Structure formats: C-alpha cells, structure tokens
Design a protein with these regions (language model features):
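Intrinsically disordered, low-complexity segments used for protein-protein interactions
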Residues: 2-6, 109-119, 188-191, 195
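An exposed acidic His-Trp-rich patch
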Residues: 91-165
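Long, compositionally biased interface segments
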Residues: 155-196
C-alpha cells in the first residue's frame, strides 16, 4: 500500500503549481499551431474566466465558451479535437485539470486519450479527489486511452506527479511523435543520468 499512499501524496503536492504554468501551456499550444496542427488563433484563446475566488482555464471559442479545438495533419488520426480545462483558486491552488483528445483513426475507429486530476474541493464532493475504490484502481492523477472515455473496461493508468505543463507535453508527444514535441529525448535523458 505504501507506493499508492506516496503517489497520492505527490499528486496532492502538484496542486501547488506556480501560476506561470498557464503561459507555458499557451506556448505549447502555439508550437502546435506553428507546426500546422491547429488554428493559429489558439495563441489568444487559451485563457481564464474569473469565477469569484476561482479562474476556469480553457481553450475558448469566438463566443467565449469552452470548445474542443480541431486538430489537423496528425499522422495517426484522421480527425481529432483537443480540450483543456482547469480550475485554479486565486491563491494558485490547482483544484482540477483535464486534457483530452477525441478523434477517429483513418479506418474510422474511434480513439480517445485523457489525463485527469479530479476536483479536490470537498465542498464540491465530500471525498474531494478520492474517487473510485482506492488509490490503486483510481489514482488521483491518471490517464485513459481507448475508443472513448466511457467504454468498459474504463482503465485508469496512474501517472507520476506531473505538472499541467508536463501533462500537456506528454499528450502532445503522443499526438505528434516528432523531435519537436518530445521534451525528454533519450540523448538528453542519458546525458542527464551521466551528470549525476
């Protein structure tokens, strides 16, 4: 049980992410647009909406509402849409973060990927971010991969304590498997290990 307790503890710690993460996420989305995978206007459409003590961050449409951003020119998906949603307290505490991609492969089969850090507000949910049966089967920070986000078995793969920026980098590295979107090239990893 100790590894699962430790994992949950690290998931709680990432909620204290610096407020600068929103600018870094925007930079990753701009890089996606610059590579021709989404509309260039995305640079100004990932923004927060004030909700009193909170800000809701998402990719916004022309009318200001949340949208799933269409993606283009992906080698393994014929169609895809990306969504990013976050709830941040004015103190900087990250209450919730979700990034998802839903689309179709060239053969018409559906495909989805999502990373979730559930809302931890106990006023919103008595158990906060403790969902499911436990920290193993439903780790606080987890990902889904499958034909959609609902088809059983609804597998939740536990993720290490990654910041919102690192989660965005991971998702983009799955969508655009190129050097430009790989934040930890093996040559860099080996060099970092050698320096230790």
């Amino acid at each position: 049980m100790i590894p699962w307790v430790n994992l949950y503890s690290t998931h709680r710690q990432i909620r204290a992410a610096a407020l600068t993460w929103t600018g870094e996420v925007r930079k990753r989305l701009v890089a996606l647009a610059d590579a021709g995978h989404c509309d260039a206007s995305i640079r100004g459409r990932f923004r927060g909406k004030n909700r009193g003590d909170f800000a809701e961050w998402s990719i916004r449409g022309v009318n200001g509402g949340e949208i799933a951003e269409p993606l283009n020119n992906l080698t393994t998906l014929a169609t895809a849409r990306i969504t990013i949603l976050a709830l941040v307290h004015n103190s900087g505490h990250l209450h919730a973060f979700t990034m998802s991609v839903e689309g179709e492969r060239p053969d018409g089969s559906k495909w989805a990927l999502a990373v979730h850090l559930p809302d931890d507000r106990v006023a919103h949910n008595e158990d906060g971010d403790r969902q499911g049966l436990g920290g193993c089967s439903h780790a606080a920070l987890h990902c889904h991969v499958g034909p959609d986000l609902e088809t059983a078995p609804n597998v939740r793969v536990p993720l290490p304590a990654l910041s919102p920026v690192e989660l965005v980098e991971w998702v983009l590295s799955q969508l655009v498997p190129t050097d430009a979107f790989e934040p930890a090239k093996w040559s860099d990893v080996v060099a970092a290990l050698t320096r230790r």
